[in-house]
């Protein structure tokens, strides 16, 4: 089974405008509300690709109920811990000539609530996949990802971590199955400018040396790189298409990687297939108004790699 964790999920209020004039009344040309959060995005894309999974984390208030209802409508199973106070945050995504995001803080998460989540995670079984994605709210210890991996290190799970800076570096001693920094985040970790795929490979290898089993690095329009635990190195240019929405592309890449790996059941071509699926799923979401569908991913896969 696949599980995703979202400490601070959201409802994303997406507004389309021709332009934004600060200090004046602005009227939208369209709007919609979508489930949001990196772990939530991974769950929804996995479901779109045909992989059952369960979204875990925290919700609160009426917005939390709306979030759970929207996930049910999309066929995504969830088992959130309901907080006693506050409300699940609403993030505003403004799509005009430039994209602007206004993200809410979200509810406070108590130590008792966090312990309930830890106990839930301790019921996972050998071979399960756990995705830890996104930032950690200020009300929680910033060691939460590391604490989870430490508590689960003997359970033989495949844990995927999509986080930045210390949140990512601190989990490396616990040998995450896969990590997915982008090229800018990779440069931030080492205090360098990443200029090309050779640089990506150089510094991604350092993350492997620190414990990461597989390092997948997204490079937006410049493609992606995977350093696999079997010593293989994969590079790809970005698929061709018109970018309509950058939100969720990285999360979609994570979902695609997991799906591609599971399709081959860890066989000889598992990492190649995982990489190619990740690249195509991330791009398919970027080329779509919402998150990628299975049909969009399959079409882009054939177009990019010449096979299904």
Predicted region positions:
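Alpha-helix C-terminal capping segments
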Residues: 44-52, 95, 260-265
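Conserved phosphate-binding/catalytic loop of the ribokinase/pfkB sugar-kinase fold
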Residues: 83, 93-126
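Short beta-strand scaffold segments in enzyme catalytic cores
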Residues: 90-94, 224-227
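Conserved phosphate/ATP/ADP-binding segment of small-molecule kinases
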Residues: 143-230
């Amino acid at each position: 089974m696949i599980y995703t964790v979202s400490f601070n999920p959201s409802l994303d209020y997406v507004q389309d405008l021709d332009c934004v004039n600060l200090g004046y009344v602005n009227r939208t040309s369209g709007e919609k509300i979508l489930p949001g959060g990196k772990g939530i995005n991974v769950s929804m894309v996995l479901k779109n690709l045909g992989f059952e999974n369960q979204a875990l984390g925290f919700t609160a208030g009426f917005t939390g109920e709306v979030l759970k209802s929207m996930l049910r409508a999309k066929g995504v199973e969830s088992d959130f811990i309901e907080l006693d106070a506050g409300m699940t945050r609403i993030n505003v995504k403004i799509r005009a000539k430039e994209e602007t995001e206004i993200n809410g803080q979200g509810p406070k998460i108590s130590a008792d609530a966090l312990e309930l989540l830890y106990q839930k995670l301790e019921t996972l079984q050998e071979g399960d996949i756990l995705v830890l994605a996104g930032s950690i709210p200020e009300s929680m210890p910033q060691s939460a990802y590391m604490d989870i991996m430490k508590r689960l290190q003997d359970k033989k799970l495949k844990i995927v971590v999509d986080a930045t800076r210390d949140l990512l570096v601190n989990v490396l001693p616990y040998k995450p199955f896969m990590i997915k920094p982008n090229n800018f985040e990779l440069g931030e970790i080492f205090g360098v400018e990443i200029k090309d795929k050779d640089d990506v490979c150089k510094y991604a290898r350092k993350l492997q040396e620190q414990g990461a089993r597989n390092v997948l690095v997204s490079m937006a329009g410049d493609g992606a790189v995977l350093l696999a635990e079997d010593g293989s190195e994969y590079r790809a240019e970005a698929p061709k298409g018109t970018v309509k929405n950058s939100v969720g592309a990285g999360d979609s890449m994570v979902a695609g990687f997991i799906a591609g790996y599971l399709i081959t059941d860890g066989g000889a071509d598992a990492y190649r297939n995982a990489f190619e699926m990740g690249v195509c799923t991330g791009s398919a979401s970027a080329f779509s108004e919402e998150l990628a569908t299975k049909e969009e991913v399959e079409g882009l896969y054939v177009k990019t790699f010449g096979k299904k």
